[in-house]
């Protein structure tokens, strides 16, 4: 702004005031003129703002549901300004889509519900080796040795059962007992169930696994399309027990309260039905936004994202060392679970499991 004085001339000089005829008092940060009219004349100024560089985009192919991961992906987008596009679907079909698209696939990130999906894509050579600062943040049990992908959150297999049920099984083998005939549920097309059976093949071998599956079918196990309806069916006493991931029950309880008529049983025998697996993600080799893909994985393995998965989705953290991320108070700690000693590589052969399922008519 300029200062214009009528009749008298006031000239402002740094640290000194010169006045003709009249007396001017200097007051910090303002000028007081005696007997004179002062006009403020607006002066046009130009402010130059240097815009940030375009943060770019990121394309995610997700086998995890939007209801589970949409909020945390949106948080990444808000924090970074990256334009994120997500294609949602089932884990194995999404992986197959990337293979079919070949070099033309727009996917930068493949985000799978379980180790089988990312393990499958890694075996096909479609995932790059991740930087050590990304893999180093994740615990050894939650990632493969070759660094092709990392676990994002931990999920335990459980038996969800009607809350009033007291005579509970203690292992997978118990479920083939005649007393459970017509009272069991499973979801053969669900990739988490397929991953559990893949681990069973590693632990028991092909023959015993096939026999267990056949015995379960002979016990009139009810087939469901996914985990959620099994939890609802157990609560409604349509079945007594379902084979699911642990966190689905807590979503029902959060909506219906503690009176919801179902509970989880974490088997303590260390067998296949007590498996703890991970959702996982890797960078697709043909992706065009590598830097943003790495930024996304760093975010998803940060304490902020890990606390989202534990606090909002009731899953387990996968970080290495003393990370300080709290497991939800409704869950047993990861250290208290007697999970089988299986590597992520042991859980990758979903294709072999699907062959067995087709042979037995489980995917019809």
State what each model feature region is.
Residues 158-165, 201, 276-289, 308:
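A bilobed periplasmic-binding-protein/Venus flytrap-type ligand-binding module shared by bacterial periplasmic
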Residues 47-120:
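Early extracytoplasmic/lumenal segment of secretory-pathway proteins
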Residues 182-191, 299-323:
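Periplasmic-binding protein-like
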Residues 174-194, 199-201:
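Short loop->beta-strand "edge-of-pocket" segments that line small-molecule binding or catalytic clefts
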Residues 105-110, 128-158, 173, 183-186:
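A structural signal for short loop-to-beta-strand junctions that line the ligand-binding cleft
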């Amino acid at each position: 702004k300029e200062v214009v004085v009528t009749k008298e001339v006031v000239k402002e000089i740094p640290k000194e005031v010169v006045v003709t005829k009249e007396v001017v008092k200097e007051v910090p940060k303002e000028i007081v003129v005696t007997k004179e009219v002062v006009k403020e004349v607006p002066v046009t100024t130009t402010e130059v703002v240097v815009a940030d560089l375009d943060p770019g985009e990121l394309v995610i192919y997700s086998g995890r549901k939007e209801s589970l991961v949409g909020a945390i992906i949106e948080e990444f987008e808000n924090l970074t300004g990256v334009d994120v596009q997500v294609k949602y679907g089932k884990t194995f079909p999404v992986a197959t889509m990337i293979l079919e698209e070949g070099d033309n696939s727009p996917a930068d990130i493949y985000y799978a519900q379980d180790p089988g999906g990312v393990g499958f894509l890694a075996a096909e050579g479609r995932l790059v080796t991740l930087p050590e600062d990304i893999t180093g943040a994740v615990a050894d049990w939650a990632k493969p040795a070759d660094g092709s992908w990392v676990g994002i959150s931990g999920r335990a297999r459980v038996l969800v059962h009607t809350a009033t049920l007291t005579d509970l099984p203690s292992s997978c083998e118990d479920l083939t007992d005649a007393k459970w005939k017509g009272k069991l549920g499973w979801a053969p097309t669900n990739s988490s169930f397929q991953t559990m059976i893949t681990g069973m093949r590693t632990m028991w071998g092909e023959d015993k696994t096939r026999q267990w599956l056949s015995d379960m079918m002979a016990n009139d196990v009810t087939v469901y399309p996914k985990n959620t309806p099994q939890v609802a069916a157990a609560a409604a006493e349509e079945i007594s027990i379902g084979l699911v991931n642990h966190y689905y029950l807590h979503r029902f309880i959060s909506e219906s309260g503690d009176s919801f008529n179902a509970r989880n049983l974490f088997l303590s025998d260390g067998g296949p039905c007590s498996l703890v697996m991970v959702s996982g993600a890797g960078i697709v080799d043909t992706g065009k936004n590598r830097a943003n893909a790495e930024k996304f994985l760093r975010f998803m393995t940060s304490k902020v994202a890990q606390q989202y998965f534990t606090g909002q989705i009731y899953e387990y953290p996968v970080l290495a060392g003393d990370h300080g991320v709290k497991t939800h108070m409704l869950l047993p700690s990861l250290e208290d679970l007697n999970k089988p000693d299986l590597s992520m590589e042991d859980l990758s052969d979903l294709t072999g499991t699907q062959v067995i399922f087709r042979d037995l008519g489980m995917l019809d």
